[in-house]
Amino acid sequence: MKIQLRSHESTYGRKMAGTRALWKANGMKVEQFNKPIIAIVNSFTQFVPGHAHLHEVGQFVKSEIEKQGCFAAEFNTIAIDDGIAMGHNGMLYSLPSRDLIADSVEYMIQAHKADAMVCISNCDKITPGMLMASMRLNIPTVFVSGGPMEAGNLNGNRLDLIEVMVQSADAFVSDEQVRQVELNACPTCGSCSGMFTANSMNCLNEAIGLALPGNGTIVATHTRRKQLFADAASLIVKNTYKYYEKGNENVLPLSIATRESFLNAMTLDIAMGGSTNTILHLLAIAHEAGVDFTMQDIDTLSRKTPCLCKISPNASKYYIQDVNRAGGIIGILSELHKSKLIDVSAKRVDGLTVAEAIRQFDICSTDVTKEALNKYKSAPGNRFNLVMASQQNDYDTLDTDRMNGCIRSTKYAYSEDGGLAILKGNIAMDGCVVKTAGIDENIFLFSGPAKVFDSQESACRGILEGKIVSGDVVVIIYEGPKGGPGMQEMLYPTSYIKSRHLGKGCALITDGRFSGGTSGLSIGHISPEAAASGNIGLVRNNDIIAINIPERTINVLLSEEELAKRRKEELQRGDAAFTPPNRKRIVPKTLRAYASMVSSADKGAVRII
Protein backbone atom coordinates (compact mmCIF):
# COMPACT_ATOMS: atom_id res chain seq x y z
CA MET A 1 0.00 0.00 0.00
CA LYS A 2 1.44 3.33 -1.08
CA ILE A 3 1.86 5.93 1.67
CA GLN A 4 1.71 9.64 0.92
CA LEU A 5 4.96 11.51 1.45
CA ARG A 6 4.92 13.67 4.58
CA SER A 7 6.46 16.48 2.51
CA HIS A 8 3.40 16.39 0.24
CA GLU A 9 1.78 18.79 2.72
CA SER A 10 4.30 21.51 1.89
CA THR A 11 5.08 20.84 -1.78
CA TYR A 12 1.84 19.83 -3.51
CA GLY A 13 -1.01 21.90 -4.93
CA ARG A 14 -1.82 25.49 -5.77
CA LYS A 15 -2.16 26.55 -2.13
CA MET A 16 1.45 25.52 -1.45
CA ALA A 17 2.89 27.83 -4.12
CA GLY A 18 4.41 30.08 -1.46
CA THR A 19 6.04 27.13 0.29
CA ARG A 20 7.42 25.84 -3.01
CA ALA A 21 8.89 29.27 -3.67
CA LEU A 22 10.74 29.00 -0.37
CA TRP A 23 11.94 25.47 -1.19
CA LYS A 24 13.24 26.76 -4.53
CA ALA A 25 15.16 29.43 -2.64
CA ASN A 26 16.68 26.56 -0.65
CA GLY A 27 17.97 25.01 -3.86
CA MET A 28 15.18 22.57 -4.66
CA LYS A 29 14.81 22.02 -8.42
CA VAL A 30 11.43 21.75 -10.12
CA GLU A 31 12.01 18.07 -10.90
CA GLN A 32 12.64 17.39 -7.20
CA PHE A 33 9.14 18.41 -6.15
CA ASN A 34 7.06 15.37 -5.24
CA LYS A 35 10.29 13.47 -4.53
CA PRO A 36 11.20 12.55 -0.95
CA ILE A 37 12.82 15.22 1.20
CA ILE A 38 15.55 13.55 3.22
CA ALA A 39 16.93 15.44 6.19
CA ILE A 40 20.62 15.22 6.98
CA VAL A 41 20.65 15.58 10.75
CA ASN A 42 24.24 16.61 11.33
CA SER A 43 26.08 17.69 14.47
CA PHE A 44 29.09 19.52 13.06
CA THR A 45 30.89 21.85 15.42
CA GLN A 46 34.44 23.07 15.77
CA PHE A 47 34.19 22.73 19.55
CA VAL A 48 34.38 18.91 19.51
CA PRO A 49 37.14 16.85 17.83
CA GLY A 50 34.65 14.06 17.30
CA HIS A 51 32.52 16.44 15.22
CA ALA A 52 35.03 18.83 13.66
CA HIS A 53 35.11 16.84 10.40
CA LEU A 54 31.35 16.36 10.06
CA HIS A 55 30.70 19.38 7.81
CA GLU A 56 32.39 17.54 4.94
CA VAL A 57 30.53 14.38 5.87
CA GLY A 58 27.16 16.12 5.69
CA GLN A 59 27.87 17.63 2.29
CA PHE A 60 29.10 14.30 0.96
CA VAL A 61 25.98 12.47 2.18
CA LYS A 62 23.79 15.21 0.64
CA SER A 63 25.47 14.81 -2.76
CA GLU A 64 25.15 11.01 -2.63
CA ILE A 65 21.42 11.23 -1.82
CA GLU A 66 20.73 13.78 -4.56
CA LYS A 67 22.53 11.62 -7.14
CA GLN A 68 19.65 9.21 -6.59
CA GLY A 69 16.91 11.75 -7.30
CA CYS A 70 15.81 12.82 -3.82
CA PHE A 71 16.20 16.26 -2.28
CA ALA A 72 18.47 16.42 0.77
CA ALA A 73 18.55 19.28 3.27
CA GLU A 74 21.00 19.53 6.15
CA PHE A 75 20.70 21.02 9.62
CA ASN A 76 22.88 20.78 12.70
CA THR A 77 22.19 20.06 16.34
CA ILE A 78 24.26 21.31 19.25
CA ALA A 79 27.06 19.05 20.48
CA ILE A 80 28.85 19.34 23.82
CA ASP A 81 32.34 17.92 24.31
CA ASP A 82 32.24 16.26 27.73
CA GLY A 83 36.03 16.36 27.97
CA ILE A 84 36.15 20.13 27.48
CA ALA A 85 33.05 20.67 29.66
CA MET A 86 34.65 18.57 32.41
CA GLY A 87 35.91 20.01 35.69
CA HIS A 88 33.75 23.16 35.79
CA ASN A 89 30.06 24.09 35.73
CA GLY A 90 29.87 23.32 32.01
CA MET A 91 29.38 19.67 32.93
CA LEU A 92 25.99 20.56 34.44
CA TYR A 93 24.77 21.13 30.87
CA SER A 94 25.98 17.90 29.29
CA LEU A 95 23.21 15.43 30.12
CA PRO A 96 20.41 18.02 29.73
CA SER A 97 21.73 18.65 26.21
CA ARG A 98 20.57 15.14 25.28
CA ASP A 99 16.95 16.27 25.60
CA LEU A 100 17.59 19.51 23.74
CA ILE A 101 19.10 17.52 20.88
CA ALA A 102 16.12 15.16 20.78
CA ASP A 103 13.70 18.09 20.87
CA SER A 104 15.54 20.07 18.18
CA VAL A 105 15.55 17.13 15.79
CA GLU A 106 11.84 16.57 16.37
CA TYR A 107 11.11 20.28 15.89
CA MET A 108 13.03 20.54 12.61
CA ILE A 109 11.65 17.34 11.09
CA GLN A 110 8.06 18.08 12.05
CA ALA A 111 8.16 21.76 11.11
CA HIS A 112 9.53 21.04 7.64
CA LYS A 113 7.77 17.71 7.07
CA ALA A 114 10.88 15.78 6.08
CA ASP A 115 10.15 12.26 4.85
CA ALA A 116 13.25 10.51 6.18
CA MET A 117 16.58 11.28 7.82
CA VAL A 118 20.22 10.33 8.02
CA CYS A 119 21.60 11.05 11.49
CA ILE A 120 25.30 11.91 11.54
CA SER A 121 26.38 11.73 15.15
CA ASN A 122 29.49 10.82 17.10
CA CYS A 123 29.95 11.94 20.68
CA ASP A 124 28.42 11.35 24.06
CA LYS A 125 24.93 12.90 24.18
CA ILE A 126 24.44 13.41 20.47
CA THR A 127 23.91 9.79 19.46
CA PRO A 128 21.38 9.06 22.25
CA GLY A 129 19.62 12.39 21.67
CA MET A 130 19.19 11.62 17.98
CA LEU A 131 18.09 8.06 18.79
CA MET A 132 15.43 9.41 21.16
CA ALA A 133 14.18 11.70 18.38
CA SER A 134 14.11 8.85 15.87
CA MET A 135 11.82 6.87 18.17
CA ARG A 136 9.44 9.81 18.53
CA LEU A 137 9.32 10.53 14.79
CA ASN A 138 9.33 6.94 13.47
CA ILE A 139 10.23 7.83 9.88
CA PRO A 140 12.85 5.98 7.78
CA THR A 141 16.17 6.64 9.50
CA VAL A 142 19.77 5.53 9.11
CA PHE A 143 22.54 6.39 11.57
CA VAL A 144 26.19 6.83 10.67
CA SER A 145 28.83 8.10 13.06
CA GLY A 146 31.88 10.22 12.32
CA GLY A 147 34.11 7.42 13.59
CA PRO A 148 36.61 7.00 16.42
CA MET A 149 39.87 8.83 16.96
CA GLU A 150 43.08 6.87 16.56
CA ALA A 151 44.91 5.97 19.78
CA GLY A 152 47.81 8.22 20.71
CA ASN A 153 51.39 7.00 20.75
CA LEU A 154 54.34 8.21 22.80
CA ASN A 155 57.66 6.42 22.48
CA GLY A 156 55.93 3.26 21.36
CA ASN A 157 53.37 3.32 24.18
CA ARG A 158 49.75 3.86 23.19
CA LEU A 159 47.65 6.27 25.21
CA ASP A 160 44.46 8.32 25.28
CA LEU A 161 42.89 11.37 26.90
CA ILE A 162 42.51 9.72 30.32
CA GLU A 163 46.27 9.26 30.59
CA VAL A 164 46.70 13.03 30.25
CA MET A 165 44.30 13.68 33.13
CA VAL A 166 45.91 11.10 35.40
CA GLN A 167 49.50 12.14 34.74
CA SER A 168 48.79 15.87 34.99
CA ALA A 169 47.49 15.38 38.54
CA ASP A 170 50.41 13.16 39.59
CA ALA A 171 53.04 15.21 41.47
CA PHE A 172 55.71 12.65 40.56
CA VAL A 173 55.29 13.28 36.81
CA SER A 174 57.43 16.08 35.36
CA ASP A 175 56.00 19.06 33.47
CA GLU A 176 57.84 17.91 30.34
CA GLN A 177 56.33 14.42 30.55
CA VAL A 178 52.85 15.92 30.95
CA ARG A 179 53.51 18.14 27.92
CA GLN A 180 54.56 15.17 25.80
CA VAL A 181 51.51 13.16 26.84
CA GLU A 182 49.28 16.15 26.08
CA LEU A 183 50.80 16.53 22.61
CA ASN A 184 50.36 12.87 21.69
CA ALA A 185 47.15 11.68 23.38
CA CYS A 186 44.63 12.89 20.76
CA PRO A 187 46.28 12.63 17.32
CA THR A 188 43.26 12.76 14.98
CA CYS A 189 39.68 13.86 14.56
CA GLY A 190 37.07 11.42 15.85
CA SER A 191 35.50 10.28 19.12
CA CYS A 192 38.06 9.49 21.85
CA SER A 193 39.88 6.24 21.19
CA GLY A 194 38.77 4.04 24.12
CA MET A 195 35.51 2.33 25.00
CA PHE A 196 34.20 5.59 26.40
CA THR A 197 30.58 6.76 26.08
CA ALA A 198 30.75 8.01 22.49
CA ASN A 199 32.27 4.85 21.05
CA SER A 200 30.11 2.67 23.30
CA MET A 201 26.94 4.27 21.90
CA ASN A 202 28.12 4.06 18.29
CA CYS A 203 28.88 0.37 18.83
CA LEU A 204 25.52 -0.25 20.50
CA ASN A 205 23.77 1.38 17.54
CA GLU A 206 24.96 -1.55 15.43
CA ALA A 207 23.26 -3.92 17.90
CA ILE A 208 20.09 -1.83 18.11
CA GLY A 209 20.07 -2.21 14.34
CA LEU A 210 19.95 1.38 13.09
CA ALA A 211 23.60 1.57 11.95
CA LEU A 212 25.66 -0.46 9.48
CA PRO A 213 28.54 -2.84 10.38
CA GLY A 214 31.71 -0.90 11.11
CA ASN A 215 29.82 2.16 12.36
CA GLY A 216 31.37 1.98 15.82
CA THR A 217 34.91 0.85 15.00
CA ILE A 218 36.35 2.07 11.66
CA VAL A 219 38.58 5.05 12.50
CA ALA A 220 37.45 8.48 11.30
CA THR A 221 40.56 9.00 9.18
CA HIS A 222 40.20 5.87 7.01
CA THR A 223 38.81 6.02 3.47
CA ARG A 224 36.45 3.12 4.23
CA ARG A 225 34.65 5.42 6.63
CA LYS A 226 33.70 7.45 3.53
CA GLN A 227 32.30 4.29 1.95
CA LEU A 228 30.19 3.85 5.08
CA PHE A 229 28.80 7.36 4.54
CA ALA A 230 28.00 6.50 0.91
CA ASP A 231 26.34 3.24 1.98
CA ALA A 232 24.19 5.11 4.52
CA ALA A 233 23.09 7.57 1.82
CA SER A 234 22.13 4.78 -0.58
CA LEU A 235 20.32 2.88 2.16
CA ILE A 236 18.19 5.81 3.28
CA VAL A 237 17.00 6.39 -0.30
CA LYS A 238 16.21 2.69 -0.69
CA ASN A 239 14.35 2.51 2.63
CA THR A 240 12.44 5.73 1.96
CA TYR A 241 11.00 4.27 -1.25
CA LYS A 242 10.35 0.95 0.49
CA TYR A 243 8.18 2.72 3.03
CA TYR A 244 6.36 5.32 0.94
CA GLU A 245 6.03 3.35 -2.31
CA LYS A 246 5.43 -0.13 -0.87
CA GLY A 247 4.18 0.55 2.65
CA ASN A 248 6.97 -1.55 4.16
CA GLU A 249 7.05 -0.61 7.85
CA ASN A 250 10.02 -2.89 8.59
CA VAL A 251 12.35 0.01 7.77
CA LEU A 252 10.95 2.23 10.54
CA PRO A 253 12.85 2.76 13.81
CA LEU A 254 10.05 1.36 15.99
CA SER A 255 10.02 -1.83 13.91
CA ILE A 256 13.78 -2.22 14.36
CA ALA A 257 14.36 -0.98 17.92
CA THR A 258 12.23 -3.64 19.61
CA ARG A 259 12.61 -5.13 23.09
CA GLU A 260 14.77 -7.86 21.55
CA SER A 261 17.06 -5.23 20.03
CA PHE A 262 17.46 -3.42 23.34
CA LEU A 263 18.25 -6.70 25.09
CA ASN A 264 20.82 -7.48 22.38
CA ALA A 265 22.38 -4.03 22.75
CA MET A 266 22.60 -4.32 26.53
CA THR A 267 24.09 -7.81 26.28
CA LEU A 268 26.73 -6.42 23.92
CA ASP A 269 27.37 -3.53 26.29
CA ILE A 270 27.96 -5.87 29.21
CA ALA A 271 30.18 -8.16 27.12
CA MET A 272 32.41 -5.31 25.94
CA GLY A 273 32.53 -3.38 29.24
CA GLY A 274 30.97 -0.25 27.80
CA SER A 275 30.47 3.06 29.56
CA THR A 276 27.94 3.10 32.41
CA ASN A 277 26.34 6.10 30.67
CA THR A 278 25.00 3.70 28.06
CA ILE A 279 22.59 2.31 30.66
CA LEU A 280 21.19 5.79 31.21
CA HIS A 281 20.81 6.29 27.47
CA LEU A 282 19.36 2.88 26.57
CA LEU A 283 16.71 3.33 29.27
CA ALA A 284 15.84 6.77 27.86
CA ILE A 285 15.72 5.57 24.23
CA ALA A 286 13.53 2.61 25.20
CA HIS A 287 11.25 5.02 27.08
CA GLU A 288 10.79 7.09 23.91
CA ALA A 289 10.18 3.90 21.91
CA GLY A 290 7.55 2.69 24.37
CA VAL A 291 9.59 -0.49 24.93
CA ASP A 292 9.43 -2.26 28.30
CA PHE A 293 13.13 -2.28 29.21
CA THR A 294 14.21 -1.66 32.79
CA MET A 295 17.05 -1.85 35.31
CA GLN A 296 15.74 -5.31 36.22
CA ASP A 297 16.42 -6.48 32.67
CA ILE A 298 19.94 -5.09 32.88
CA ASP A 299 20.54 -6.82 36.21
CA THR A 300 19.33 -10.15 34.78
CA LEU A 301 21.56 -9.82 31.71
CA SER A 302 24.59 -8.80 33.77
CA ARG A 303 24.42 -12.06 35.74
CA LYS A 304 24.62 -14.31 32.68
CA THR A 305 26.64 -12.33 30.12
CA PRO A 306 30.42 -12.90 30.15
CA CYS A 307 33.03 -10.19 29.65
CA LEU A 308 34.55 -10.85 26.21
CA CYS A 309 36.42 -7.61 25.63
CA LYS A 310 38.57 -5.28 27.73
CA ILE A 311 39.29 -2.04 25.93
CA SER A 312 40.79 1.16 27.34
CA PRO A 313 40.01 2.41 29.98
CA ASN A 314 39.33 -1.09 31.34
CA ALA A 315 42.72 -2.30 30.10
CA SER A 316 45.61 -0.51 28.40
CA LYS A 317 46.37 -3.15 25.76
CA TYR A 318 43.47 -2.53 23.38
CA TYR A 319 41.67 0.45 21.83
CA ILE A 320 38.67 0.76 19.51
CA GLN A 321 40.87 0.37 16.43
CA ASP A 322 41.86 -3.07 17.78
CA VAL A 323 38.19 -4.07 18.08
CA ASN A 324 37.85 -3.27 14.38
CA ARG A 325 40.82 -5.47 13.50
CA ALA A 326 39.21 -8.29 15.50
CA GLY A 327 35.99 -8.09 13.49
CA GLY A 328 34.19 -5.18 15.09
CA ILE A 329 30.85 -5.36 16.84
CA ILE A 330 29.64 -8.14 14.58
CA GLY A 331 32.56 -10.20 15.91
CA ILE A 332 31.39 -9.76 19.51
CA LEU A 333 27.75 -10.45 18.57
CA SER A 334 28.85 -13.63 16.82
CA GLU A 335 30.56 -14.94 19.97
CA LEU A 336 27.47 -14.09 22.03
CA HIS A 337 25.28 -15.86 19.46
CA LYS A 338 27.36 -19.05 19.70
CA SER A 339 26.36 -19.24 23.37
CA LYS A 340 22.73 -18.28 22.57
CA LEU A 341 22.95 -15.04 24.54
CA ILE A 342 21.31 -12.79 21.92
CA ASP A 343 18.22 -12.95 19.72
CA VAL A 344 19.50 -13.20 16.16
CA SER A 345 16.02 -12.92 14.63
CA ALA A 346 16.04 -9.18 15.41
CA LYS A 347 15.73 -6.96 12.33
CA ARG A 348 18.24 -4.40 11.12
CA VAL A 349 17.98 -1.22 9.06
CA ASP A 350 19.82 -2.87 6.14
CA GLY A 351 17.08 -5.50 5.82
CA LEU A 352 19.17 -8.27 7.33
CA THR A 353 18.46 -10.12 10.53
CA VAL A 354 21.25 -10.21 13.10
CA ALA A 355 21.87 -13.83 12.07
CA GLU A 356 22.30 -12.84 8.42
CA ALA A 357 24.61 -9.95 9.35
CA ILE A 358 26.78 -12.32 11.39
CA ARG A 359 26.98 -14.77 8.51
CA GLN A 360 28.11 -12.07 6.08
CA PHE A 361 30.28 -9.89 8.33
CA ASP A 362 31.81 -12.16 10.99
CA ILE A 363 35.48 -12.51 10.00
CA CYS A 364 35.50 -16.03 11.49
CA SER A 365 32.51 -17.13 9.37
CA THR A 366 33.03 -19.40 6.38
CA ASP A 367 30.53 -17.22 4.49
CA VAL A 368 32.20 -13.89 5.29
CA THR A 369 32.22 -11.49 2.36
CA LYS A 370 35.30 -9.85 0.87
CA GLU A 371 33.72 -6.49 1.70
CA ALA A 372 33.66 -7.43 5.38
CA LEU A 373 37.25 -8.65 5.42
CA ASN A 374 38.41 -5.39 3.85
CA LYS A 375 36.25 -3.31 6.21
CA TYR A 376 37.89 -4.79 9.28
CA LYS A 377 41.41 -4.45 7.88
CA SER A 378 41.01 -0.65 8.08
CA ALA A 379 43.93 0.53 10.22
CA PRO A 380 45.03 3.80 11.82
CA GLY A 381 47.24 6.17 9.83
CA ASN A 382 49.59 6.69 12.80
CA ARG A 383 50.14 10.40 12.20
CA PHE A 384 48.56 13.67 13.27
CA ASN A 385 45.54 14.04 10.99
CA LEU A 386 42.36 16.11 11.26
CA VAL A 387 40.95 15.20 7.83
CA MET A 388 38.21 12.60 7.56
CA ALA A 389 38.69 9.56 5.31
CA SER A 390 42.15 10.67 4.21
CA GLN A 391 44.37 7.61 4.71
CA GLN A 392 44.26 4.01 3.45
CA ASN A 393 46.44 2.03 5.85
CA ASP A 394 45.39 -1.60 6.18
CA TYR A 395 46.38 -4.32 8.61
CA ASP A 396 48.21 -7.21 6.94
CA THR A 397 46.24 -9.71 9.03
CA LEU A 398 43.05 -9.75 11.06
CA ASP A 399 42.84 -10.71 14.74
CA THR A 400 40.86 -13.97 14.79
CA ASP A 401 42.38 -15.19 18.07
CA ARG A 402 39.35 -15.82 20.27
CA MET A 403 41.47 -17.24 23.10
CA ASN A 404 43.86 -14.37 23.82
CA GLY A 405 42.93 -11.73 21.22
CA CYS A 406 41.01 -8.49 21.49
CA ILE A 407 37.65 -10.30 21.26
CA ARG A 408 37.40 -13.55 23.22
CA SER A 409 34.98 -16.43 22.90
CA THR A 410 32.70 -17.19 25.85
CA LYS A 411 34.93 -20.19 26.64
CA TYR A 412 37.92 -17.88 27.20
CA ALA A 413 36.00 -14.91 28.67
CA TYR A 414 37.67 -12.56 31.13
CA SER A 415 34.86 -13.35 33.57
CA GLU A 416 31.63 -15.34 33.55
CA ASP A 417 29.54 -12.31 34.39
CA GLY A 418 30.16 -9.24 32.33
CA GLY A 419 31.61 -5.78 32.51
CA LEU A 420 28.62 -3.94 34.02
CA ALA A 421 26.54 -4.70 37.10
CA ILE A 422 23.51 -3.35 38.97
CA LEU A 423 23.82 -3.14 42.76
CA LYS A 424 21.01 -2.56 45.27
CA GLY A 425 20.85 -1.91 48.99
CA ASN A 426 19.67 0.51 51.64
CA ILE A 427 21.42 3.47 49.99
CA ALA A 428 20.36 2.45 46.48
CA MET A 429 16.86 1.03 46.81
CA ASP A 430 16.19 1.48 43.08
CA GLY A 431 19.68 0.45 42.03
CA CYS A 432 23.04 1.85 40.99
CA VAL A 433 25.60 0.99 38.33
CA VAL A 434 29.22 -0.15 38.38
CA LYS A 435 31.60 -0.99 35.52
CA THR A 436 33.13 -4.21 36.82
CA ALA A 437 35.38 -4.58 33.76
CA GLY A 438 37.51 -1.74 35.10
CA ILE A 439 37.89 -3.05 38.68
CA ASP A 440 40.62 -5.19 40.19
CA GLU A 441 38.87 -8.37 41.37
CA ASN A 442 40.69 -8.11 44.71
CA ILE A 443 38.37 -5.24 45.68
CA PHE A 444 35.08 -6.78 44.55
CA LEU A 445 34.37 -6.98 48.30
CA PHE A 446 35.07 -3.59 49.86
CA SER A 447 34.06 -1.76 53.00
CA GLY A 448 35.32 1.43 54.54
CA PRO A 449 34.45 4.71 56.21
CA ALA A 450 32.50 7.27 54.21
CA LYS A 451 34.01 10.63 53.37
CA VAL A 452 30.99 12.69 52.32
CA PHE A 453 31.04 15.65 49.90
CA ASP A 454 28.05 17.59 48.60
CA SER A 455 29.61 18.47 45.25
CA GLN A 456 32.19 17.25 42.76
CA GLU A 457 34.27 20.38 43.37
CA SER A 458 34.56 19.81 47.13
CA ALA A 459 35.43 16.15 46.52
CA CYS A 460 38.24 17.14 44.14
CA ARG A 461 39.63 19.55 46.72
CA GLY A 462 39.48 16.90 49.41
CA ILE A 463 41.30 14.33 47.28
CA LEU A 464 44.02 16.75 46.15
CA GLU A 465 44.51 18.02 49.73
CA GLY A 466 45.21 14.49 50.92
CA LYS A 467 42.04 14.05 52.96
CA ILE A 468 41.37 10.66 51.35
CA VAL A 469 43.44 7.64 52.37
CA SER A 470 43.47 4.00 51.36
CA GLY A 471 40.37 2.22 52.61
CA ASP A 472 38.05 5.24 52.35
CA VAL A 473 34.78 5.39 50.44
CA VAL A 474 34.37 8.79 48.79
CA VAL A 475 30.64 9.68 48.77
CA ILE A 476 29.56 12.50 46.45
CA ILE A 477 25.90 13.48 46.87
CA TYR A 478 23.50 16.02 45.37
CA GLU A 479 25.00 15.49 41.91
CA GLY A 480 22.10 13.47 40.46
CA PRO A 481 19.76 14.64 37.68
CA LYS A 482 17.75 16.84 40.08
CA GLY A 483 20.44 17.57 42.63
CA GLY A 484 23.14 18.89 40.31
CA PRO A 485 21.08 19.64 38.43
CA GLY A 486 22.36 17.83 35.38
CA MET A 487 24.10 14.75 36.82
CA GLN A 488 27.74 15.67 36.32
CA GLU A 489 30.36 13.13 35.33
CA MET A 490 32.92 12.39 38.04
CA LEU A 491 35.96 11.89 35.83
CA TYR A 492 38.19 14.32 37.69
CA PRO A 493 37.62 12.79 41.15
CA THR A 494 38.35 9.30 39.83
CA SER A 495 41.39 10.54 37.89
CA TYR A 496 42.72 12.32 40.98
CA ILE A 497 42.25 9.16 43.05
CA LYS A 498 44.31 7.31 40.45
CA SER A 499 46.94 10.04 40.34
CA ARG A 500 47.43 9.62 44.11
CA HIS A 501 47.86 5.87 43.56
CA LEU A 502 44.66 5.03 45.44
CA GLY A 503 42.86 3.39 42.51
CA LYS A 504 42.96 -0.05 44.15
CA GLY A 505 42.54 1.24 47.69
CA CYS A 506 39.46 3.46 47.56
CA ALA A 507 35.88 3.40 46.33
CA LEU A 508 33.82 6.31 45.03
CA ILE A 509 30.03 6.25 45.12
CA THR A 510 27.66 8.95 43.87
CA ASP A 511 24.20 9.78 42.62
CA GLY A 512 26.02 11.47 39.76
CA ARG A 513 27.51 9.59 36.85
CA PHE A 514 30.89 8.73 35.41
CA SER A 515 32.72 9.40 32.21
CA GLY A 516 33.16 6.45 29.91
CA GLY A 517 36.85 6.96 30.66
CA THR A 518 36.39 6.00 34.31
CA SER A 519 37.77 2.80 35.80
CA GLY A 520 38.27 1.57 39.37
CA LEU A 521 35.65 0.95 42.06
CA SER A 522 33.37 3.76 40.92
CA ILE A 523 29.65 3.31 41.58
CA GLY A 524 27.20 5.80 40.12
CA HIS A 525 23.56 6.49 39.27
CA ILE A 526 22.53 5.79 42.89
CA SER A 527 18.73 5.89 42.89
CA PRO A 528 16.77 7.46 44.37
CA GLU A 529 19.23 10.33 44.39
CA ALA A 530 19.81 12.55 47.43
CA ALA A 531 17.69 15.37 45.99
CA ALA A 532 14.80 12.90 45.58
CA SER A 533 14.96 12.07 49.31
CA GLY A 534 17.14 9.02 48.74
CA ASN A 535 18.95 7.40 51.66
CA ILE A 536 22.29 8.30 50.05
CA GLY A 537 21.55 11.82 51.35
CA LEU A 538 21.52 10.50 54.93
CA VAL A 539 25.07 9.12 54.89
CA ARG A 540 27.52 10.93 57.19
CA ASN A 541 31.28 10.97 57.57
CA ASN A 542 32.73 7.73 58.93
CA ASP A 543 29.59 5.65 58.39
CA ILE A 544 30.75 2.27 57.10
CA ILE A 545 29.80 1.53 53.49
CA ALA A 546 29.85 -2.16 52.49
CA ILE A 547 30.10 -3.09 48.79
CA ASN A 548 29.71 -6.67 47.56
CA ILE A 549 29.88 -6.91 43.78
CA PRO A 550 29.43 -10.72 43.52
CA GLU A 551 26.25 -10.43 45.62
CA ARG A 552 25.24 -7.17 43.88
CA THR A 553 24.75 -5.26 47.14
CA ILE A 554 25.69 -1.85 48.52
CA ASN A 555 24.70 -0.76 52.03
CA VAL A 556 25.50 1.71 54.76
CA LEU A 557 25.88 -0.29 57.96
CA LEU A 558 23.14 1.47 59.89
CA SER A 559 19.93 0.14 61.37
CA GLU A 560 16.55 1.02 59.88
CA GLU A 561 15.84 2.90 63.08
CA GLU A 562 18.93 5.08 62.67
CA LEU A 563 18.07 5.82 59.04
CA ALA A 564 14.50 6.73 60.06
CA LYS A 565 15.84 9.03 62.77
CA ARG A 566 18.15 10.80 60.32
CA ARG A 567 15.33 11.15 57.80
CA LYS A 568 13.12 12.78 60.44
CA GLU A 569 15.93 15.20 61.31
CA GLU A 570 16.45 16.05 57.64
CA LEU A 571 12.75 16.68 57.03
CA GLN A 572 12.73 19.16 59.91
CA ARG A 573 14.72 21.46 57.61
CA GLY A 574 11.44 22.09 55.76
CA ASP A 575 11.81 23.35 52.20
CA ALA A 576 15.58 22.99 52.53
CA ALA A 577 15.32 19.25 53.25
CA PHE A 578 17.41 17.09 50.94
CA THR A 579 19.31 20.02 49.51
CA PRO A 580 23.03 20.66 50.10
CA PRO A 581 23.29 23.03 53.10
CA ASN A 582 26.80 24.30 52.43
CA ARG A 583 27.12 24.29 48.65
CA LYS A 584 27.23 27.61 46.83
CA ARG A 585 26.25 26.94 43.24
CA ILE A 586 24.38 29.29 40.93
CA VAL A 587 21.68 27.32 39.13
CA PRO A 588 20.21 29.16 36.11
CA LYS A 589 16.58 28.93 35.01
CA THR A 590 17.42 26.49 32.21
CA LEU A 591 18.77 23.92 34.65
CA ARG A 592 16.03 24.60 37.20
CA ALA A 593 13.48 23.79 34.50
CA TYR A 594 15.36 20.56 33.72
CA ALA A 595 15.44 19.61 37.42
CA SER A 596 11.69 20.17 37.78
CA MET A 597 10.86 17.44 35.25
CA VAL A 598 13.70 14.91 35.33
CA SER A 599 13.51 11.41 36.78
CA SER A 600 16.20 9.65 38.79
CA ALA A 601 18.84 7.69 36.91
CA ASP A 602 17.12 4.31 37.25
CA LYS A 603 14.51 5.58 34.77
CA GLY A 604 17.17 6.99 32.42
CA ALA A 605 16.95 10.60 33.66
CA VAL A 606 14.01 11.13 31.30
CA ARG A 607 11.50 13.94 31.53
CA ILE A 608 8.41 13.14 33.53
CA ILE A 609 5.57 15.33 32.25
Swiss-Prot record:
Modified residues (N6-carboxylysine): 125
PROSITE patterns tied to this protein: ILVD_EDD_1, ILVD_EDD_2
Any Gene Ontology CC annotation: cytosol
Catalytic residues (positions): 515
UniProt keyword annotation of Nucleotide-binding present: no
Cofactor(s), by name: [2Fe-2S] cluster; Mg(2+)
EC number: 4.2.1.9
Any Pfam family hit: ILVD_EDD_N
InterPro entries per record: Dihydro-acid_dehy_C, DihydroxyA_deHydtase, DiOHA_6PGluconate_deHydtase_CS, ILV_EDD_C, ILV_EDD_N, IlvD/EDD_N
GO biological process: isoleucine biosynthetic process; L-valine biosynthetic process
Cofactor binding remark: Binds 1 [2Fe-2S] cluster per subunit. This cluster acts as a Lewis acid cofactor.
Residues that, per the record, bind Mg(2+): 82, 124-125, 489
Pathway membership, UniProt: Amino-acid biosynthesis; L-isoleucine biosynthesis; L-isoleucine from 2-oxobutanoate: step 3/4; Amino-acid biosynthesis; L-valine biosynthesis; L-valine from pyruvate: step 3/4
Binding site for [2Fe-2S] cluster: 123, 192
Swiss-Prot/TrEMBL catalytic activity: (2R)-2,3-dihydroxy-3-methylbutanoate = 3-methyl-2-oxobutanoate + H2O; (2R,3R)-2,3-dihydroxy-3-methylpentanoate = (S)-3-methyl-2-oxopentanoate + H2O
Family: Belongs to the IlvD/Edd family.
Subunit structure: Homodimer.
Function per UniProt: Functions in the biosynthesis of branched-chain amino acids. Catalyzes the dehydration of (2R,3R)-2,3-dihydroxy-3-methylpentanoate (2,3-dihydroxy-3-methylvalerate) into 2-oxo-3-methylpentanoate (2-oxo-3-methylvalerate) and of (2R)-2,3-dihydroxy-3-methylbutanoate (2,3-dihydroxyisovalerate) into 2-oxo-3-methylbutanoate (2-oxoisovalerate), the penultimate precursor to L-isoleucine and L-valine, respectively.
Name this protein carries in UniProt: Dihydroxy-acid dehydratase
Organism: Azobacteroides pseudotrichonymphae genomovar. CFP2
